[in-house]
Swiss-Prot record:
It comes from Homo sapiens. Disulfide bonds join 26-145, 63-79, 159-228, 192-210, 218-246. This is Tryptase gamma. GO terms for cellular component: extracellular space; plasma membrane. The gene is TPSG1. Glycans are attached at residue 85.
Length: 321
């Protein structure tokens, strides 16, 4: 896909200036390389995805999740179909392998957007988990960046999904149960709607985003993060929700679209005593633009349809050096 008009204009920006700035500390692992290339995935290097969480029900891994701040984890609502009692759950952070580690966080509360028993195609498959005590951030435990509510992720953008799920249909993750990663590309909504037909057209809902590999998320990856790199930091575009099988042709993985719920996330975190600065997000730059650059950026906003415009090989173009 060729560069969009927004991409062409951004290339004219002065060095070191971009449309967005990042809150320090989010989405920047100290391991710079994403590693090898979950179904069709590879073992992730230690520290590559420091926001990755393992949600466990009575010490057994049931879902993935992502750390938003020292006390909040994002996951999927359907992960809580086994119990709604917060004391039944533990959250493990900073771990590469699924082990019976004695180091874990207990859960203060679970906030669901929808019923955990919802069927595939049900909107609102997202949940927040408040930890009983804030975790200490380190090179192995860091938050992911959140998008803005108005953000979109264009078809063809290459992102990554991580988890401890099945490596293919019917095949659980083998020992040593290491975190796996796989690269996927965002699929345009109309194609995904055709791939998942239903009464009245499609079972795909507006709050859903699709991505395919050849790799894919699978059972036990639910709730885990789909992240895309923006200006050198990783931003969560979606949470693993559902799909028909794992890695099947014309059956992309379906994710809950995180931008659709950023305001919901903010509202519940602040209502529970947190501050808006208590979790990372991507604020728009408020100023410091040269007059000529300002005109270019205004034109970009008017012409662009998505947050990210892929380059010719489908990857986001980088921020200016």
């Amino acid at each position: 896909m060729a560069l969009g008009a927004c991409g062409l204009l951004l290339l004219l920006a002065v060095p070191g200036v971009s449309l967005r700035t990042l809150q320090p500390g989010c989405g920047r692992p100290q391991v710079s390389d994403a590693g090898g290339r979950i179904v069709g995935g590879h073992a992730a290097p230690a520290g590559a995805w420091p926001w990755q969480a393992s949600l466990r029900l009575r010490r057994v891994h049931v879902c993935g999740g992502s750390l938003l701040s020292p006390q909040w984890v994002l996951t999927a609502a359907h992960c809580f179909s086994g119990s709604l009692n917060s004391s039944d759950y533990q959250v493990h952070l900073g771990e590469l392998e699924i082990t019976l580690s004695p180091h874990f966080s207990t859960v203060r509360q679970i906030i669901l957007h929808s019923s955990p028993s919802g069927q595939p195609g049900t909107s609102g498959d997202i949940a927040l988990v408040e930890l009983s005590v804030p975790v200490t951030l380190s090179s192995r435990i860091l938050p992911v960046c959140l998008p803005e509510a108005s953000d979109d992720f264009c078809p063809g953008i290459r992102c990554w999904v991580t988890g401890w799920g099945y490596t293919r249909e019917g095949e659980p993750l083998p020992p040593p149960y290491s975190l796996r990663e796989v690269k996927v590309s965002v699929v345009d909504t109309e194609t995904c709607r055709r791939d998942y037909p239903g009464p009245g057209g499609s079972i795909l809902q507006p709050d859903m985003l699709c991505a395919r590999g050849p790799g894919d998320a699978c059972q036990d990856d639910s709730g885990g993060p789909l992240v895309c790199q923006v200006n050198g930091a990783w931003v969560q575009a979606g949470t693993v929700s559902w799909g028909e099988g794992c890695g099947r042709p014309n059956r992309p993985g379906v994710y809950t679209r995180v931008p659709a719920y950023v305001n919901w996330i903010r509202r519940h975190i602040t209502a529970s005593g947190g501050s808006e600065s208590g979790y990372p997000r991507l604020p728009l730059l408020a100023g410091f633009f040269l007059p000529g650059l300002f005109l270019l950026l205004v034109s970009c906003v008017l012409l662009a349809k998505c947050l990210l415009h892929p380059s010719a090989d489908g990857t986001p173009f980088p921020a200016p050096d």
